Amino acid sequence: MTKIMFFGTRDYEKEMALNWGKKNNVEVTTSKELLSSATVDQLKDYDGVTTMQFGKLENDVYPKLESYGIKQIAQRTAGFDMYDLDLAKKHNIVISNVPSYSPETIAEYSVSIALQLVRRFPDIERRVQAHDFTWQAEIMSKPVKNMTVAIIGTGRIGAATAKIYAGFGATITAYDAYPNKDLDFLTYKDSVKEAIKDADIISLHVPANKESYHLFDKAMFDHVKKGAILVNAARGAVINTPDLIAAVNDGTLLGAAIDTYENEAAYFTNDWTNKDIDDKTLLELIEHERILVTPHIAFFSDEAVQNLVEGGLNAALSVINTGTCETRLN
């Protein structure tokens, strides 16, 4: 019987993974550990592996997988910047991802958390907790229909986000290297700077790559409309975090919401209750009154989890049986 290791198992995924195994006549072993130099030897007797990595995979894992006859790693996220695709290819390892598992879920997150900032909910909540129930100009908002929203990246998630904002009646600008002709309700601009210059809300939906690394830094924030709101449900490396904090502090941004953080791997998805966090930048984000932080959870719905579990396992089995899969990256 084919054997697949399901690394990075969350409690809510285990039953889904085992049920998939029964349906597909595959022996699935679940483990809460991640694939790493320390765990790769567990795969000696396995045919395939799926995992949910957040940090970089060590280089010595690839040749070990090759020596064990394993031909793939199925990543259970859309992001794949934790892998060295060229090194994997050198060792005959197919890397795959799950590019679309519930774009609507992430789009709903992006819009809902932006609306919290639009309606000044963090400020209002602090006032109410202090028993201040007055109406002040500082907590007055304006309708989204009177706003311009910039969508940076109009793939599945960005497109879904744009459609929600269109339902509010917002004016929508966008930038993508490959414009989507079906999104005829928005206006594409020739650059990110052009797309954001009049935007009240900026919503990021781009992958992590050389072109997007620290795309939003001080130089980019200099082109932002004063008082704009920034939402990042894409990848942490898209933003230069100290520059983001500075932009909020000096009023360039009214506020920001981030679901991803460049150095999140050691913290996000782990319980740090009653433990000391050494990352001063992360602490500054968390403690900032005008920055909302969530732990890479924009995708987190029952539909998305089911699709990620099955997407990873289906890709692993496809490579085992055929040598390739529809979602291969290298």
Curated annotation (Swiss-Prot):
InterPro entries: D-isomer_2_OHA_DH_cat_dom, D-isomer_DH_CS, D-isomer_DH_CS1, D-isomer_DH_NAD-bd, NAD(P)-bd_dom_sf. It comes from Staphylococcus aureus. PROSITE patterns: D_2_HYDROXYACID_DH_1 (PS00065), D_2_HYDROXYACID_DH_2 (PS00670), D_2_HYDROXYACID_DH_3 (PS00671). NAD(+) binds at residues 156-157, 176, 206-207, 233-235, 259. SUPFAM superfamilies: Formate/glycerate dehydrogenase catalytic domain-like (SSF52283), NAD(P)-binding Rossmann-fold domains (SSF51735). CDD domains: LDH. Its EC number is 1.1.1.28. This is D-lactate dehydrogenase. Keywords: NAD, Oxidoreductase. The keyword DNA damage does not apply.
